[in-house]
């Protein structure tokens, strides 16, 4: 049976140094160039393009992150300024309210004092008038009593 395998082979078998070995070497080199041209270069190009895309995407992302951070700090500053301005407006409104309250209280107090003073003057006037009337009636009554007493004598 071993002779059956060697039927087509010559004396040296597979390791004969005839034209087969250089032909195989040429086939390997040719296959390498073909694979390089058809497979490795396109795949390498796709990998490089993908790497460039990833690098540019990463650079754009870093740039956008920097822009977002800048906008965030600007917005925080604006928010802080708005809060300070709102506090200032609230404080001014409180002061205005306090001033209006004090003015209204002073006006009400002065009006109450004026009204009380007017009422006191009216009462004094009416009292003086009543006293004068009482005095004149007392004088009249005294005169009447004197006249009656003198008339009886």
UniProtKB/Swiss-Prot annotation:
It is a single-pass membrane protein. The keyword Membrane applies. It comes from the Bacteria. Pfam families: ATP-synt_B. One of its GO terms (cellular component) is plasma membrane-derived thylakoid membrane. Keywords: ATP synthesis, CF(0), Hydrogen ion transport, Ion transport, Membrane, Thylakoid, Transmembrane, Transmembrane helix, Transport. The keyword Thylakoid applies. GO terms for molecular function: proton-transporting ATP synthase activity, rotational mechanism; proton-transporting ATPase activity, rotational mechanism. The chain crosses the membrane at residues 20-40. Gene3D superfamilies: F1F0 ATP synthase subunit B, membrane domain. F(1)F(0) ATP synthase produces ATP from ADP in the presence of a proton or sodium gradient. F-type ATPases consist of two structural domains, F(1) containing the extramembraneous catalytic core and F(0) containing the membrane proton channel, linked together by a central stalk and a peripheral stalk. During catalysis, ATP synthesis in the catalytic domain of F(1) is coupled via a rotary mechanism of the central stalk subunits to proton translocation. NCBIfam families: PRK07353.1. F-type ATPases have 2 components, F(1) - the catalytic core - and F(0) - the membrane proton channel. F(1) has five subunits: alpha(3), beta(3), gamma(1), delta(1), epsilon(1). F(0) has four main subunits: a(1), b(1), b'(1) and c(10-14). The alpha and beta chains form an alternating ring which encloses part of the gamma chain. F(1) is attached to F(0) by a central stalk formed by the gamma and epsilon chains, while a peripheral stalk is formed by the delta, b and b' chains. This is ATP synthase subunit b'. It comes from Prochlorococcus marinus (strain NATL1A). The lineage of its organism: Bacteria, Bacillati, Cyanobacteriota, Cyanophyceae, Synechococcales.
């Amino acid at each position: 049976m071993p002779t059956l395998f060697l039927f087509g082979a010559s004396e040296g078998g597979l390791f004969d140094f005839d034209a087969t070995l250089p032909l195989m070497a040429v086939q390997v080199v040719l296959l390498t160039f073909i694979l390089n041209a058809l497979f490795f270069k396109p795949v390498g190009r796709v990998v490089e393009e993908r790497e460039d895309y990833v690098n540019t995407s990463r650079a754009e992302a870093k740039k956008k992150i920097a822009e977002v951070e800048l906008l965030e700090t600007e917005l925080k500053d604006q928010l802080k300024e708005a809060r300070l301005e709102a506090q200032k407006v609230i404080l001014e409104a409180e002061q205005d309210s306090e001033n209006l309250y004090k003015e209204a209280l002073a006006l009400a107090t002065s009006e109450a004092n004026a009204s009380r003073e007017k009422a006191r003057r009216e009462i004094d006037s009416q009292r003086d008038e009543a006293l004068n009337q009482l005095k004149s009636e007392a004088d009249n009554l005294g005169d009447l009593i004197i006249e009656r007493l003198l008339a009886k004598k």
